[in-house]
Regions:
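Membrane-helix interface "capping/anchor" motifs
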Residues: 61-74, 110-119
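Hydrophobic transmembrane alpha-helices
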Residues: 2-62
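Hydrophobic alpha-helical transmembrane segments
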Residues: 17-22, 53, 57, 70-77, ...
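Interfacial aromatic-anchored transmembrane helix boundaries in multi-pass membrane proteins
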Residues: 35-43, 79-108, 140
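Alpha-helical transmembrane segments of multipass membrane proteins
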Residues: 23-34, 58-59, 83, 100, ...
Length: 183
């Protein structure tokens, strides 16, 4: 698939909605054990920021594959609704739809849903990880720790977001697009 998307290809079709729903359900099921793993890893405040980005890759991957306005919010909604009964966070998962979906949607809007190069995907991952990192810093007391731990957490958040959220989505998305199943 070409990196650029035609401006005339912005309208949603039933096919787009169904593919988004199917991908979101599959990635939502994958997100359930990831949620438990990341919840466990929160006990390690110097390691968690690095892997935090893995939880953000599902909606970024769907955005990369579908490339339509609103796809991140729809995908995030489906993924998080699926996680409500199966994760320890329950209904709080729904707050993540706007908290993480909206910044991602804005990033792709700035790129006019046309830029999906590796650098742009890394930026998308960094943005959403920094938003998640702010919540993590406040709620888990990172701001009360030594400045070196704080700096380490910031660097890990940026690198982890770029790699595990942005670039992982690009790499998996490229492999999926090569198969032709999204055509």
């Amino acid at each position: 698939m070409n990196e650029n998307v035609s401006i005339f290809n912005r309208k949603w079709s039933t096919h787009d909605i169904m593919i988004t729903a199917v991908l979101s359900i599959a990635l939502g099921l994958l997100n359930i054990p990831l949620t438990y793993a990341t919840a466990y890893l929160m006990a390690f405040p110097t390691f968690f920021p690095f892997i935090m980005g893995i939880g953000f890759f599902p909606p970024i991957l769907v955005a990369y594959l579908i490339r339509k306005p609103g796809v991140v919010l729809l995908s995030s909604l489906i993924i998080m609704v699926l996680g409500v009964p199966f994760t320890p966070y329950g209904v709080m998962m729904l707050g993540q739809v706007l908290m993480y979906g909206l910044p991602l949607e804005i990033v792709f809007l700035i790129g006019r849903y046309k830029h999906f190069e590796s650098w742009f995907m890394a930026i998308a991952g960094i943005v959403v990880s920094v938003v998640g990192g702010i919540l993590y810093f406040v709620s888990y007391g990172i701001l009360n720790m030594d400045i070196t731990i704080q700096l380490l957490a910031v660097v890990e958040t940026v690198i982890g977001g770029a790699v595990f959220a942005g670039l992982l989505s690009k790499w998996i998305g490229d492999a999926v697009l090569k198969t032709g199943v999204i055509q």
